[in-house]
């Protein structure tokens, strides 16, 4: 039998050094659920009252609208899908249904891949940052201050920020995956114990039945008498 050290067991089943991976997955799912619910409320209010979030072309520095109705509907659909995925992950971690966590885990992988592509783009094309900042509207907060920063320092700052963000996202992915493995392992062990207990009950009869003399046993032959 393989022995596992207590600290190894605690590390593999814990996150943030303070809570279980199952609890951490539930909290992470609730956090994402709240964020997407707030985004959905903002989008619905903007769809109900377009003038509240309307920006003219002069404010945006171009001849285009901030967001039309088609893009608004797509954003609302994405928010609803994210709410469903986060709710499934929260419910799956709470009720210990490992399959319900898979969609949220796939979303984390997709988000991590997108951020990695952004980091690679910044690293390969550092001048694209300056071009992107120039395209921002003049009323954008701290636009002039960002433009005045040394381009090399700006690239390093952005890469450092993306690196920290990727590290955090990678750790959260490992926590969700550990929760999935924990629930799968626990369900498998419960099934194994159930099957083993049933087999033991069938194979081992009660002690009284095993030691009792059956009523159909043959009587011993009569004693031998010599002639």
Swiss-Prot record:
The chain crosses the membrane at residues 26-46, 72-92, 100-120, 153-173. Undergoes proteolytic cleavage following delivery to the lysosomes. It is found in: Endomembrane system; Late endosome membrane; Cell membrane; Cell projection. It is a multi-pass membrane protein. GO terms for molecular function: ceramide binding; kinase binding; phosphatidylinositol bisphosphate binding; ubiquitin protein ligase binding. One of its GO terms (biological process) is regulation of lysosome organization. Belongs to the LAPTM4/LAPTM5 transporter family. Required for optimal lysosomal function. Blocks EGF-stimulated EGFR intraluminal sorting and degradation. Conversely by binding with the phosphatidylinositol 4,5-bisphosphate, regulates its PIP5K1C interaction, inhibits HGS ubiquitination and relieves LAPTM4B inhibition of EGFR degradation. Recruits SLC3A2 and SLC7A5 (the Leu transporter) to the lysosome, promoting entry of leucine and other essential amino acid (EAA) into the lysosome, stimulating activation of proton-transporting vacuolar (V)-ATPase protein pump (V-ATPase) and hence mTORC1 activation. This is Lysosomal-associated transmembrane protein 4B. It comes from Mus musculus (Mouse).
